[in-house]
């Protein structure tokens, strides 16, 4: 059985995809999101940086943002949503945070000077990838953070999930974010389930997430070749063969 830890809406979509491929899965959503700002005010002459689907979805709800707003985005799905909504000034779509840093270093600095932009407005959740944020601030470009949402995390496993782990029914656990990986490990320690989880194969969306698990003593860990759900499902097929 595969344990899905994504927020409920995304978890249901993934469960449906896995069911179609013949996989049995169980949902335990480690987190849920809550929008903080009802009205989004984007700073004039700043480049908007969107690094998650959730931030992109909230950004797209605003009716007061120009379709010519300069945008940098991480993730092909987010880019597609922006394109469909009519935003035609996407400066770059990166596959992950490292690729985005590469674009900023090699190309955005020149664009920033030519277009006379005032800085980068990083639209994100309350919790962010601190390593990425640190790298983002190392260039001579002002960076302003705008928090669009916050994540609420579960404080314990529910009874069904705990029993599935204790009975070693869970064979694979998928983790899509560093925050969820840390929360999963926290709950495992709290419930004293470390030994039961040693047999679980952890499949993650990135090397950074895998590193968190390996640092906690778990060695049955792999990450998708590309940071997207399609690549993760392809990797899953190799694991459960």
Positions of predicted regions on the chain:
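Signature of uroporphyrinogen-III synthase
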Residues: 1-241
